[in-house]
Design a protein with these regions (language model features):
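Mid-domain Rossmann-like dinucleotide-binding core that forms the NAD(H)/NADP(H) cofactor-binding site
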Residues: 135-214, 218
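NAD(P)H dinucleotide-binding glycine-rich loop of Rossmann-like/cofactor-binding domains
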Residues: 87-167
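Residue-level marker of beta-strand positions
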Residues: 63, 79-80, 94, 120, ...
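C-terminal substrate-binding/catalytic core of Rossmann-like NAD(P)-dependent dehydrogenases/reductases
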Residues: 265-315, 326
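C-terminal capping/lid region of NAD(P)-dependent oxidoreductase domains
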Residues: 2-3, 222, 226, 256-257, ...
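Glycine-rich beta-strand-centered segment in the early N-terminal region that forms part
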Residues: 24-38, 51-93, 132-134
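Glycine-rich cofactor phosphate-binding loops and adjacent beta1-alpha1 units
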Residues: 156, 199, 204-280
Length: 346
């Protein structure tokens, strides 16, 4: 095994370098994974360009899959795996009941420790989610956002015959729509201000609204006979869309906050009245469940493998690590349509 590898190493905010770094040193209970595919999450943009990671230098990247090349157990070598990126302490109160996303002292691949914008990564065996060669590495790398979307649908308590409105039609928004269908929703309405995303959503068979041209609240009310959606999921992290979700949901309905805001958000008095008068249920959603009782990663991977959740159309751009400037440029400049942008190691 060589002593160095190529990686995208974040030395400071805005200072992401494609360079040689030491090969990861595998500890007991870890495997060395050759990264074959790693998606760029929307959260990676502020992580790289505005907010930074928890320390420098750090290799970002938390949506990934690869092949095990070293392990304590020789039978694991050669197996394929996606990776749950959260490393819980396994000691706190939340961890004791399997709610690892609520861990009070967690670590995380790609933000608190080195991630997968690299040729190799050392990961805990506990975090591995195995898959066979009927599934591509690219599809398996979509397991992380798929599991996050599945968790949000669970928070929204989507049921058979429901109408679900999703504000934000990016990769997560599309997967929210796919999971809502799987949960039995009879109508899924996606809302976005980007006409290319609206058109893409329509090509996936969704009812989609361009919020710049059509008032999404009025549209949702019209489509539901004035009743409103059973559940609204706000995935943009914007005050305006959150308030639209409050107005578009039915009385006694559920609004789930999912989008990460870029700054403070202000709720108007009218929006607050919507909560009071309609007696709404407000929920947050964070990460995904990864325990013996409810493992959303295994559910997501099985759904992706069967193409019940078909993630293949969502992968719009593929780049080698050496073309990171181009990859991030697609997402930052927004001059062309993109959905999931992914780094591929051949």
């Amino acid at each position: 095994m060589k002593n160095t590898m190529k990686a995208l190493n974040l030395h400071a905010v805005g200072d992401l370098r494609y360079e040689d770094v030491p090969m990861p040193v595998r500890q007991a209970g870890e495997v060395l994974l050759k990264v074959h595919a790693c998606g760029i999450c929307g959260s990676d943009l502020p992580r790289v360009f505005t907010k930074g990671t928890y320390h420098f230098p750090t290799i970002p990247g938390h949506e990934f899959a690869g092949e095990i090349v070293e392990a304590d157990d020789p039978s694991l070598v050669g197996r394929r795996a996606a990776v749950f990126p959260l490393l819980p302490c396994r000691k706190c109160e939340a961890c004791q009941v399997g709610e690892y996303a609520q861990c009070s002292d967690y670590d995380y691949y790609g933000s608190r420790r080195d991630g997968a914008f690299a040729e190799y990564i050392a990961v805990k065996e506990w975090n591995l989610v195995f898959f066979d060669d009927s599934l591509s590495y690219e599809e398996a790398a979509m397991c992380e956002p798929a599991a996050v979307a599945l968790h949000a649908i669970g928070q929204a308590s989507v049921g058979i015959g429901d109408t679900v409105a999703v504000f934000g039609a990016g990769p997560i928004g599309i997967m929210l729509g796919l999971w809502a269908r799987t949960a039995g929703a009879c109508r899924v309405i996606l809302c976005d201000i980007d006409p290319t995303k609206v058109e893409f959503a329509r090509k996936q068979g969704f009812d989609a609204v361009n919020s710049r041209e059509t008032d999404p609240v009025e549209y949702i009310r019209t489509q539901t006979g004035g009743r409103g959606a059973d559940a609204c999921i706000e995935g943009a992290g914007v005050a305006q869309t959150w308030e639209q979700a409050l107005k578009a949901v039915k009385s006694f309905g559920t609004v789930v906050s999912m989008g990460n805001p870029a700054g403070d958000m202000t709720l108007t008095q009218k929006g607050y009245w919507e909560i009071l008068r309609k007696q709404l249920t407000l929920k947050g959603t964070w990460n995904s469940s990864y325990n013996d009782v409810r493992n959303e990663w295994r559910t997501a991977l099985a759904a992706i493998a069967s193409h019940r959740i078909d993630v293949r159309p969502l992968i719009s751009h593929r780049f080698p690590l050496s073309e990171a400037d181009k990859a991030f440029g697609v997402m930052r400049e927004r001059k062309e349509f993109f959905n999931k942008v992914m780094f591929i190691n051949r």
